[in-house]
Amino acid sequence: MKQHIIPALRLTLACIFFFCGLYSLLILGIAQVSPGKGEGETVSVNGKVVGYALEGQNFSNDQYFWSRPSAVGYNAAGSGGSNKGTTNPDYLKDVTSRIDSFLVHNKSVNKKDIPSELVTASGSGLDPDISRKAAYVQIPRIAKARGMSEDAVQAIVEKHIDHPLLGVMGTEKINVLSLNIDLDRATIK
């Protein structure tokens, strides 16, 4: 029996040393040479941190583009989805509620034209980006709330479209935080 326990303990200790020690130090070292030193990419306006580029946040004012809903209340410490299936009554109630709320604030939009990403939470609950379609459907509400032309708001959206890598890897996306910051800058001018 001793001949089985000692090798098992050695292997356990070696794995703990490697995965809890060396691997963690390796990842920390890689993070230190990356931009932002592993701290996350903060976004500042006038010297004040207003958010993180890779973390979604809640925008509910009609003057701003809205992010994708979060199942975790945009809490980075609790990142994750709701894990409710599409036939779950609670999930359907949440989605229906989001659709109704969206239609109240976006009177010119038909229910069938709402992109699913604006009423369903992402897997992480912290998605910072929306699609071009999700931005376009919000333009009339924002233009009206800010007293801007729809063309002016659309021009700002166009500047914020991140195209797929090499034209094929991924989809077009728009970072909601940077878009809203630029929208504020354009309105202040």
Predicted regions: what is each one?
Residues 1-16:
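Membrane-entry signal-anchor segments at the cytosolic-membrane interface
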Residues 7, 20, 26-145, 161-164:
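Flexible, solvent-exposed loop/hinge segments and secondary-structure transition points
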Residues 13, 17-21, 159:
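Hydrophobic alpha-helical transmembrane segments in multi-pass membrane proteins
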Residues 13, 27, 175-178:
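Hydrophobic side chains within alpha-helical segments
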Residues 141-189:
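Extracytoplasmic/periplasmic C-terminal soluble domains
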